[in-house]
């Protein structure tokens, strides 16, 4: 299953906490099944796109970073995979 996750840094995160966040990220590496990772140009967070059937791994990642940021994870489909259900809905 494909997911897009938006992460938002907690407001007013001190530089020392940003350093600790980067240390955690360096240690953990990319999330299991990560396809892409984009950072917001305004410096407030970013987005990851991943594919996984293991919700437990995603939960473990969210817990590891929860002191620094919040998450919104949404299941997504590629457009070509959505066309069949859309056509069925419209018929």
Regions picked out by a protein language model, each given a short descriptive name:
Residues 1-91:
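Conserved, structured core segments of small domains
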């Amino acid at each position: 299953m494909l997911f897009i996750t938006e992460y938002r840094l907690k407001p007013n995160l001190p530089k020392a906490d940003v350093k600790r966040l980067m240390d955690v990220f360096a240690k953990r590496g990319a999330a299991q099944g990560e396809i892409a990772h984009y950072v917001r140009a305004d410096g407030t967070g970013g987005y990851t796109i991943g594919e996984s059937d293991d919700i437990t791994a995603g939960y473990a990642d969210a817990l590891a970073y929860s002191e620094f940021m919040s998450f919104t994870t949404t299941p997504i489909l590629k457009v070509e995979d959505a066309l069949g259900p859309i056509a069925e809905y419209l018929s």
